[in-house]
């Protein structure tokens, strides 16, 4: 049966709360909002004190924008899409450890278990990729490659 739920977390909610999280961590918001038809990452923020950037691809829950037939299938497709989109934006020469680009994918908390099972920690380590999960109340959890390694080893 098709699912549409107005209580699902949409992409804008994920994006807004990840931005708030990064601002608290010292990153600057340029105030620009990417339209759905525009190309590029959903969030690009520079640290206020040094040349480090965060590039984040955000996804919302299936059913937040319209009817879906398979929640799980749509969720898997969203995960694959986010990973592909962020990897396709890794065209940078800035590779220094403390200045350069940090890449991330951000999802609603309902994606957490599936993403943790799907993305290997060593891929996150080599790609400088972190994970963000947004709760219904707006709280954000950030998981780095080393935290992901501990989670995956304890399963």
Predicted feature descriptions by range:
Residues 40-44, 53-57, 104:
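Short hydrophobic-acidic sequence motifs that mark active-site Asp/Glu residues
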Residues 60-111:
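Catalytic cores of nucleic-acid endonucleases
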Residues 18-26, 86, 90-94, 120-124:
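Hydrophobic, Leu/Ile/Phe/Ala-enriched alpha-helical segments that form helix-helix packing faces
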Residues 1-39, 46-51, 62, 96-98:
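Acidic-basic catalytic patches of nuclease active cores, encompassing PD-(D/E)XK
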């Amino acid at each position: 049966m098709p699912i549409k739920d107005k209580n699902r977390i949409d992409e804008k909610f994920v994006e807004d709360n990840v931005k708030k999280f990064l601002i608290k961590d010292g990153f600057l918001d340029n105030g620009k909002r990417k339209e759905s038809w525009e190309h590029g990452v959903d969030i690009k923020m520079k640290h206020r004190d040094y040349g480090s950037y965060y590039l984040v691809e955000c996804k919302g829950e299936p059913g937040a924008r319209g009817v879906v037939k398979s929640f799980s299938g749509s969720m898997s497709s969203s995960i694959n899409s986010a990973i592909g989109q962020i990897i396709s934006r890794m065209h940078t020469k800035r590779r220094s450890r403390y200045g350069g680009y940090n890449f991330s994918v951000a999802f609603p908390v309902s994606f957490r278990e599936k993403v943790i099972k799907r993305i290997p920690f060593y891929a996150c380590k080599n790609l400088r990729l972190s994970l963000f999960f947004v709760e219904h109340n707006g709280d954000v959890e950030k998981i780095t490659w080393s935290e992901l390694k501990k989670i995956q080893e304890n399963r």
